[in-house]
From Swiss-Prot:
Optimum pH is 4.8. It catalyses: Random endo-hydrolysis of N-acetyl-beta-D-glucosaminide (1->4)-beta-linkages in chitin and chitodextrins. This is Endochitinase EP3. Residues 70-273 are annotated as: Catalytic. Residues 29-63 form the Chitin-binding type-1 domain. Induction: Accumulates rapidly and transiently in leaves after inoculation with Xanthomonas campestris. Slightly repressed by wounding. SMART domains: ChtBD1.
Length: 273
């Protein structure tokens, strides 16, 4: 028979072991996942790359591929940047807002942008990013979506990111960030109130570029190996892909192939969607 002292010691050890096991089990359950599933960047459970890849919060997350030694700043030269923005009219608000310096400052927070895979992969990713930015902003002319304030970009089903009825979640910035379910997590990741101050994306050029890079690294970069067409689908597939708007798709492709030419890299396959 155990003495009371020994019994209490064993009980304490048992409790500690149970608590430790419970803690390990619940690490992947903060968003309702079982321990063998990943909690995605959006708070959903699963075990594929959509859940365990980029942005995975908890669980058996996949290790990201190692970054290469490419210098994005050496590829995105002032000449390259000017070649885009110089095509915007002098009256464009974006001329006084967007700059290579703001892009590079924002880039400091996204160390994997343009640095995954081979040197050619990096150049293709950079070309793809600026192709979409060129299309979305009209060569850095527009900061905000034309007539965006008149449009409703509040998805009430995205209850995790409740809309402020006095705010609009229309397109802003280089990638034209839209919808409350993008402004909310982007603000959390970057450090601004995306739901209550979405206009920050149109007033702070560094934050503006950060939202574009946030969207890119979380929503677009995971599919970039599938070709430029996959990046179109990730950005605006519902409105453009599968024959919905072939003219717009071709416009994006033209920008992409032109930038690939400027950066000295083959554009690859699967250019359309």
């Amino acid at each position: 028979m155990l003495t009371p002292t020994i019994s209490k010691s064993i009980s304490l050890v048992t409790i500690l072991l149970v608590l430790q096991a419970f803690s390990n089990t619940t690490k992947a359950q903060n968003c309702g996942c079982s321990s063998e599933l990943c909690c995605s960047q959006f708070g959903f459970c699963g075990n594929t790359s959509d859940y365990c890849g980029v942005g995975c919060q908890q669980g058996p997350c996949f290790a990201p591929p190692p970054a290469n030694g490419v210098s994005v700043a050496e590829i995105v030269t002032q000449e390259f940047f000017n070649g885009i923005i110089s095509q915007a009219a002098s009256s464009c608000a974006g001329n006084r807002f967007y700059s290579r310096g703001a892009f590079l400052e924002a880039l400091d927070s996204y160390s994997r942008f343009g640095r995954v895979g081979s040197t050619d992969d990096s150049r293709r990713e950079i070309a793809a990013f600026f192709a979409h930015v060129t299309h979305e902003t009209g060569h850095f002319c527009y900061i905000e979506e034309i007539d965006g304030a008149s449009k409703d970009y509040c998805d009430e089903n995205a209850t995790q990111y409740p809309c402020n009825p006095n705010k609009g979640y229309y397109g802003r910035g280089p990638i034209q960030l839209s919808w409350n379910f993008n402004y909310g997590p982007a603000g959390t990741a970057i450090g601004f109130d995306g739901l209550n101050a979405p206009e920050t994306v149109a007033t702070d050029p560094v934050i503006s570029f950060k939202t574009a890079l946030w969207y890119w690294t979380n929503r677009v970069q995971p599919v970039i190996s599938q070709g430029f067409g996959a990046t179109i689908r990730a950005i605006n597939g519902a409105l453009e892909c599968d024959g919905a708007n072939t003219a717009t798709v071709q416009a994006r492709v033209r920008y992409y192939t032109d930038y690939c030419r400027q950066l000295g890299v083959d554009p690859g396959n699967n250019l359309t969607c």
